[in-house]
């Protein structure tokens, strides 16, 4: 953690349909998924963004919960939306979608429109 005392954000990206070239440092191989973590060190007034490559074959990485308990909801959201599992997370369960929901809606290969959703009409009264 090297003095980075606050987790600012954690999110994920699915590069399945990305046609551009992704350049990573140190000869790292780009994977389908990337978990992006933003941290801050208040004493040194520094910020850091960590990009972690996650394999599509086994989309699992270690949880940050022991270092930054504030990651609990953010990791659950990444699991719910992208299907990325955070090993040793205290409650790796859905947080936005119903528990019986099939699939992960922010994956690029998710079947859009496969499940009809009835939206409530907006009222004309103001």
Functional labels for PLM-detected ranges:
Residues 1-126:
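Terminal low-complexity/charged segments
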């Amino acid at each position: 953690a090297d003095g980075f005392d606050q987790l600012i954000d954690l999110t994920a990206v699915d590069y399945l349909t990305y046609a551009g070239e992704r350049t990573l440092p140190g000869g790292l191989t780009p994977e389908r998924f990337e978990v992006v973590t933003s941290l801050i060190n208040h004493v040194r007034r520094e910020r850091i963004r960590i990009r972690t490559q996650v394999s599509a074959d086994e989309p699992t990485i270690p949880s940050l919960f022991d270092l930054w308990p504030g990651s609990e909801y953010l990791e659950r959201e990444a699991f719910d939306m992208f299907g990325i599992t955070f090993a040793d997370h205290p409650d790796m369960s859905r947080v936005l979608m119903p528990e019986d929901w099939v699939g992960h809606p922010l994956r690029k290969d998710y079947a859009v429109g496969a499940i009809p959703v009835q939206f409530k009409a907006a009222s004309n009264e103001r």
